[in-house]
Amino acid sequence: MPFKEITPQQAWEMMQQGAILVDIRDNMRFAYSHPKGAFHLTNQSFLQFEELADFDSPIIVSCYHGVSSRNVATFLVEQGYKNVFSMIGGFDGWCRAELPIDTTY
């Protein structure tokens, strides 16, 4: 596997050290709630992401349950990013770990 899998708690700790967490869920779900400080990565926001992250930046990919994040993590590695992680359990795991979220409710 060209990337590592980490727990939501590890992801939060890495974010405190400057890692970028990207949430790849759909627009409505992201707008409703997402991990605090997450960047919403979509096809439309990819150019903005490229300006935000350099190839050595630690990047954590989060999805719904930790499955589709693996595909995006692989894609990012193929684009040249060297420090990529997939978050086990996705946003569901993040919520179960009771980590901070940004929400509209």
UniProtKB/Swiss-Prot annotation:
State the family named in the UniProt similarity comment for this chain.
Belongs to the GlpE family.
Q: Which UniProt keywords apply?
A: Cytoplasm, Transferase
Q: Which residues form the active site?
A: 63
The protein's job, in short, is: Transferase that catalyzes the transfer of sulfur from thiosulfate to thiophilic acceptors such as cyanide or dithiols. May function in a CysM-independent thiosulfate assimilation pathway by catalyzing the conversion of thiosulfate to sulfite, which can then be used for L-cysteine biosynthesis.
Q: Which reaction does it catalyse?
A: thiosulfate + hydrogen cyanide = thiocyanate + sulfite + 2 H(+); thiosulfate + [thioredoxin]-dithiol = [thioredoxin]-disulfide + hydrogen sulfide + sulfite + 2 H(+)
Would I find Cytoplasm among this entry's keywords? yes
Q: Where is the Rhodanese domain?
A: 15-103
**Subcellular compartments:** Cytoplasm
Q: What is this protein called?
A: Thiosulfate sulfurtransferase GlpE
Which Gene Ontology molecular function entries are recorded, alphabetically?
Answer: thiosulfate-cyanide sulfurtransferase activity
**What NCBIfam families has UniProt attached to this entry?**
PRK00162.1
EC number(s) on record? 2.8.1.1
Give a GO biological-process term: glycerol metabolic process
| Top-level taxon in the UniProt lineage | Bacteria
Q: Cellular component GO terms, alphabetically?
A: cytoplasm
